[in-house]
Amino acid sequence: MYQLLFELLQVALGNSEHLSRKFTVSQWNQAYIQAKEQVGAVCFGAIEKLSPEERPPSDLLMQWIALAESQRQYYQHYKKVLASLASFYRQYGVKMLLLKGYGLSLDYPVPELRPAGDIDIYLIPESGPICYDGIVKEYADQAVECCWGIEIGREYKKHSHFLIDGVVVENHDTFIDTDKHKSNLRFQSYLENLLVEKTNSNDNKLNENFLLESPVPNCYLPSATWNALFLLRHAGEHFATEKITLRHVLDLGIFFQSHSSEIDWDFVLQVYEKENMIDFYNAISTICTRFLWMNGGYFYGAIDREDLANKVLRDIFTEYKPLPMSNEALSKMSIIHYGVVKSLRWWKNRWKYKMVYNENILESFWGLAVNRLNN
């Protein structure tokens, strides 16, 4: 059912040169629908490599060309907004750490074909100690409000958000959502500790080996070890609470393929084990090796788990009715309905929760149910 989609991704990643056979018009249409939202432009990168005989019918090919061109144009616009934002923060003595997004695209065979979404950032002072108290974030948000006249949304604890030229920016106070999961408090501390080193006065000084320069001035990327923790946890949170897409899998696979030799694997695997994420890691690595034909050597310590990989893939291709991120602006009865529906969905998908969080499942279920009614 998904053979053509995966063969296109294999070609796009350089793991294959040709399709295995000639596919029907119906199969091409199905692959386009499957790919369109998250990996459509990436698949077009494969189509460009194929011989004319292997390509889709001309009418569908034109749709694919339009999709890829739209993505290329947005990517260039996205980069301009990113550069403008980084330059603005530099004037205020603030370094911009980029989470996900553009940094991951740099490892793709054709960076501009990776779908660009929000700009997720974490701000760090150029000098002085790093304090996890939100002061730098709020200082920067007020500067954006004052100088650019842009309204800042502050309703979420995890990050503020604002819109620049059609691009959503999320300015993070924490790297992951520490409000809903106890284990995320531990995970947040792993990420914070990698960012800093203690001084003689017990202040948190920036670990200079942590920040990696990007092609955009004052826009920094995190270390490979940090990303190995953050990216899997970030994808895992999407997976456990709702679902992930093939783009999440591609991001992880391409990241490990590009940076495996830079990762402190002893530390990373220790955290995966402690936080109960090994099964999720094994599932992702198996999808990458079995279905995308990536080299298993990049996924250090991973075990082939075809059973889990197939289960995760079935979930990826299952359509879920979207629910709002919060119950804000819902009526009282709608809030109750929202909480019940979301809790029932979570309970049905508790097998996913067990692959990501090291928590008591009944205690967490009750806590999340109450949280959904209140938020």
Where are each of the predicted segments found?
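Conserved NTP-donor binding/palm subdomain of two-metal-ion nucleotidyltransferases/polymerases, i.e.
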Residues: M1-G117, L123-N375
